[in-house]
């Protein structure tokens, strides 16, 4: 990571600590209990947060096989995909954004993948996630993208909770890059 990237990461971690992180007992989407909650949207949806995640995640794409689009997993991954897509355009390597829905709506386009009109069969796509816990929602998004014709090349997470999710995704054959981990918020405190 470049010096500029390191300072961007430090600022993003500070923003996440300030706006998104709460140390309290919660039940997560996975059904697991946790001693902390991180609502990344509270940081990502600020102008600065949007710029920081766009830059850092675009840079992190360099650790994955080359992609031609980025896909955000509903809901937290959607602003990430938009931020990276905008950054990619500004840096001269435009990548369209896709949004992967959790389920088809019963009205409108009834699509599982929004933005799919530009999706060519076999197109390499990187998935962007806000938080990885078990990896379950990410792996479901992988299947939805594959059904839509994409070739998923890897996953970039804003936060890896270090609870086995990244390992589950890697076990499915996909590389995972995390911008931050639980250690950025709770140093030397293993999950559980």
Curated annotation (Swiss-Prot):
Enzyme Commission number, as recorded: 2.4.2.10
Keywords associated with the record: Glycosyltransferase, Magnesium, Pyrimidine biosynthesis, Transferase
Binding site for orotate: 133, 161
Keyword Ion transport part of the UniProt annotation: no
Reactions catalysed: orotidine 5'-phosphate + diphosphate = orotate + 5-phospho-alpha-D-ribose 1-diphosphate
GO biological process, one term: pyrimidine nucleobase biosynthetic process
Gene Ontology molecular function, alphabetical: magnesium ion binding; orotate phosphoribosyltransferase activity
InterPro entries membership: OPRT, Or_phspho_trans_dom, PRibTrfase_dom, PRTase-like
Binding site for 5-phospho-alpha-D-ribose 1-diphosphate: 101-102, 105, 107, 129-137
Obligatory cofactor(s): Mg(2+)
Pathway the protein takes part in: Pyrimidine metabolism; UMP biosynthesis via de novo pathway; UMP from orotate: step 1/2
Function: Catalyzes the transfer of a ribosyl phosphate group from 5-phosphoribose 1-diphosphate to orotate, leading to the formation of orotidine monophosphate (OMP).
Subunit structure: Homodimer.
The protein's name in its UniProt record: Orotate phosphoribosyltransferase
Organism: Sorangium cellulosum (strain So ce56)
Organism lineage: Bacteria, Pseudomonadati, Myxococcota, Polyangia, Polyangiales
Gene: pyrE
């Amino acid at each position: 990571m470049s010096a500029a990237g390191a300072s961007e990461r430090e600022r993003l971690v500070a923003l996440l600590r300030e706006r998104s992180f709460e140390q309290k007992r919660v039940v997560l989407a996975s059904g697991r209990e946790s001693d902390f909650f991180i609502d990344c949207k509270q940081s990502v949806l600020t102008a600065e947060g949007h710029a920081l995640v766009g830059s850092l995640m675009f840079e992190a794409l360099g650790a994955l096989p080359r992609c031609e689009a980025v896909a955000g997993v509903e809901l937290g991954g959607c602003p990430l995909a938009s931020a990276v897509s905008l950054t990619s355009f500004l840096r001269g390597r435009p990548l369209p954004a896709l949004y992967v829905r959790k389920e088809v709506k019963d009205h409108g386009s009834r699509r599982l993948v929004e933005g799919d009109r530009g999706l060519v069969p076999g197109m390499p796509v990187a998935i962007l996630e806000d938080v990885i816990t078990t990896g379950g929602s990410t792996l479901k998004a992988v299947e939805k993208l594959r059904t839509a014709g994409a070739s998923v090349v890897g996953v970039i997470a804003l936060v890896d909770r270090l609870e086995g999710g990244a390992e589950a995704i890697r076990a499915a054959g996909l590389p995972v890059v995390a911008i931050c981990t639980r250690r950025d918020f709770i140093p030397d405190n293993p999950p559980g």
